[in-house]
């Protein structure tokens, strides 16, 4: 019996109790909250449903709680139900009912933890979207890991997810990038507002190698050749780095296409037609303050050029017009103002603003020996995705980025993540999976299988702890999807690995040399197999490998 199953049982029991007394059953919450008590001596689970509804039905909380506890205790799945404090109900499951969790995991396999929470939803998930003017930096690396993991979690929750990279190839930053390449090719100093680093020289040299006569072209043609070829080469490197990192995209959307296709002009005309654009002081303004923004925004400047928000307006419209009903933007710490701005843009275009979500990620720093690591040899100024992978590997880089909430700034201690010890979180979790695989191999060598185990034998405290932890996984995935917080999966994996290691230290899973296999060994092997499955499922959701040997 999973916590979700127990929640349903408690609710149905409450409905029966209230109905028998001709009391209002509509006061019950949609989902009865079931939690594990801090003190395991109090039981396996606890609920406060009696406290929630007692006053609404005119009963004393303890009196109602006792009636509910007595009714629950009559169920064969419940070993004990008792009242504590002002009306909490503590519940201890029967061993057979608790063991059902193991059977459910083994039956569901790789889909355990999945749900239909967002079945039928089409989600556009835009993340990374770094300018094609340099390698992916640490902020982009965080989004590459977290965004990919969030996509996996949403898909596990039934959503159809489009992973999208917005390719900023329209604007002043491309001019600066081009000027930097040209200066490098000519052997001139980097422009004052240009980009430095070895990668600029590498790309400039590659452009010259591909087009030997490029430096003899007229200035306009020379700049265009370096712009087009340089951006193409830089973006190819970005794609390659992301692919090796385990992050791929379904759509690479070019900002420039919004202008070339007429999408920006079309969006502006729509806003004029629906009255959400007005002319003032030589410019066209969006009535964004009417839709929750802190002020109106200039869309067409007095010189006739489109402001940056013009592309944002056309882009959000394009996302909805492609059939997405939820658009999630994952942006850097300097984009807080975009939350109200993008929602206002959607509303002004006639779309539901609540279907636009903006997640803001905080800064990432690398630390070694207690000091910040700031320089990248290749990039010149910032640490890159490639630098991090080279230092701690792909799994370490992904996991280090995912395991903390993006709401908080992140310091990555390179010494910690380089260790092959239990102090390293990803090593700790992966070692748990590898140890479980080793157990499965040894069981196979001994001819022991987990077919038709008697799971009611799993009564040891460590067995119960492990089973209850496994049972939490579906709720963890659900919360990670609803709250857009994939770090919950990583933290759960660490908790599960720790609970397993404690079980392993306390319970003999396989018979000792010279002993015959007993039913308890079969039951514990089934529990170990279920744990291996859930650890693998969790690691898959964060995009980290589940090694069979370490």
Swiss-Prot record:
GO biological process, one term: arginyl-tRNA aminoacylation
InterPro entries: aa-tRNA-synth_I_CS, Arg-tRNA-ligase, Arg-tRNA-synth_N, Arg-tRNA-synth_N_sf, ArgRS_core, DALR_anticod-bd, Rossmann-like_a/b/a_fold, tRNAsynth_Ia_anticodon-bd
Alphabetical keyword list: Aminoacyl-tRNA synthetase, ATP-binding, Cytoplasm, Ligase, Nucleotide-binding, Protein biosynthesis
EC top class named in words: ligase
Source superkingdom: Bacteria
Pfam families (alphabetical): Arg_tRNA_synt_N, DALR_1, tRNA-synt_1d
Compartments, as annotated in UniProt: Cytoplasm
SUPFAM superfamilies: Anticodon-binding domain of a subclass of class I aminoacyl-tRNA synthetases, Arginyl-tRNA synthetase (ArgRS), N-terminal 'additional' domain, Nucleotidylyl transferase
Recorded GO MF terms: arginine-tRNA ligase activity; ATP binding
EC number: 6.1.1.19
Catalysed reaction, written as an equation: tRNA(Arg) + L-arginine + ATP = L-arginyl-tRNA(Arg) + AMP + diphosphate
SMART domains named among the record's database cross-references: Arg_tRNA_synt_N, DALR_1
Motif 'HIGH' region positions after renumbering to this chain: 130-140
Principal localisation: cytoplasm
Cellular component terms (Gene Ontology): cytoplasm
Similarity comment: family membership: Belongs to the class-I aminoacyl-tRNA synthetase family.
Assembly: Monomer.
PANTHER family: ARGININE--TRNA LIGASE, CYTOPLASMIC (PTHR11956:SF5), ARGINYL-TRNA SYNTHETASE (PTHR11956)
NCBIfam families linked to this entry: argS
Name listed for the protein in its UniProt record: Arginine--tRNA ligase
Species this chain originates from: Corynebacterium diphtheriae (strain ATCC 700971 / NCTC 13129 / Biotype gravis)
Gene (UniProt): argS
């Amino acid at each position: 019996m999973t916590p979700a199953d127990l929640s349903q049982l408690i609710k149905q029991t409450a409905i029966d109790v209230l109905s028998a007394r001709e009391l209002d059953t509509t006061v019950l919450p949609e989902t009865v909250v079931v939690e594990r008590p801090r003190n395991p001596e109090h039981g396996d689970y606890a609920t406060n449903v009696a406290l929630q509804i007692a006053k609404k039905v005119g009963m004393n909380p303890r009196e109602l709680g006792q009636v509910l506890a007595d009714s629950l205790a009559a169920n064969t799945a419940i070993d004990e139900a008792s009242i504590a404090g002002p009306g909490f109900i503590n519940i201890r499951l029967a061993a057979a009912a608790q063991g059902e969790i193991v059977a459910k995991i083994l039956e569901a396999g790789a889909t355990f933890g999945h749900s239909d929470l967002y079945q039928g939803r089409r989600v556009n998930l835009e993340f990374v979207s770094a300018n094609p003017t340099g390698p992916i930096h640490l902020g982009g690396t965080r989004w590459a890991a977290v965004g990919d993991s969030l996509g996996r979690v949403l898909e596990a929750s039934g959503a159809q997810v489009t992973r999208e990279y917005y390719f900023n190839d329209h604007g002043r930053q491309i001019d600066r990038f081009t000027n930097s390449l040209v200066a490098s090719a000519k052997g001139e100093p980097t422009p004052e507002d240009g980009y430095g680093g070895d990668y600029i020289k590498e790309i400039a040299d590659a452009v010259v190698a591909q087009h030997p006569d490029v430096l003899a072209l007229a200035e306009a043609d020379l700049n265009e050749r370096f712009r087009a070829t340089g951006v193409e080469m830089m973006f190819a490197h970005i794609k390659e780095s992301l692919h090796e990192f385990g992050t791929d995209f379904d759509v690479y959307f070019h900002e420039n296409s919004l202008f070339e296709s007429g999408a920006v002009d079309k969006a502006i005309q729509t806003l004029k037609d629906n009255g959400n654009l007005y002319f003032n002081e030589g410019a066209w303004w969006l009535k964004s303050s009417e839709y929750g923004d802190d002020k109106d925004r200039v869309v067409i400047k007095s010189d006739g050029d489109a402001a940056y928000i013009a592309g944002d307006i056309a882009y959000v419209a394009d996302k909805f017009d492609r059939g997405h009903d939820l658009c999630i933007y994952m942006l850097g710490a300097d984009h807080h103002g975009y939350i109200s701005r993008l929602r206002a843009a959607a509303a002004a275009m006639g779309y539901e603003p609540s279907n636009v979500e903006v997640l803001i990620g905080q800064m990432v720093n690398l630390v070694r020996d207690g000091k910040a690591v700031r320089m990248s040899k290749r990039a010149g100024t910032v640490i890159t995705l490639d630098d991090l992978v080279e230092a701690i590997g792909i799994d370490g880089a992904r996991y280090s980025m995912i395991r903390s909430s993006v709401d908080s700034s992140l310091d990555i201690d390179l010494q910690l993540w380089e260790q092959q010890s239990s102090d390293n979180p990803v090593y700790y979790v992966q070692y748990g999976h590898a140890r479980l695989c080793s157990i499965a191999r040894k069981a196979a060598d001994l001819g022991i299988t987990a077919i038709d185990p008697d799971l009611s034998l799993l009564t040891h405290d460590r067995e119960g702890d492990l089973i209850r932890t496994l049972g939490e996984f579906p709720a963890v995935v659900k919360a990670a999807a609803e709250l857009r917080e994939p770090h919950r999966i990583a933290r759960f994996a660490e908790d599960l690995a720790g609970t397993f290691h404690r079980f392993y230290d306390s319970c003999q899973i396989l018979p000792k040399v010279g002993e015959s296999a007993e039913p308890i060994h079969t039951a514990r092997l089934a529990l170990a197999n279920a744990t291996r499955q859930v650890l693998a499922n969790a690691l898959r959701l964060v995009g980290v490998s589940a090694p069979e040997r370490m």
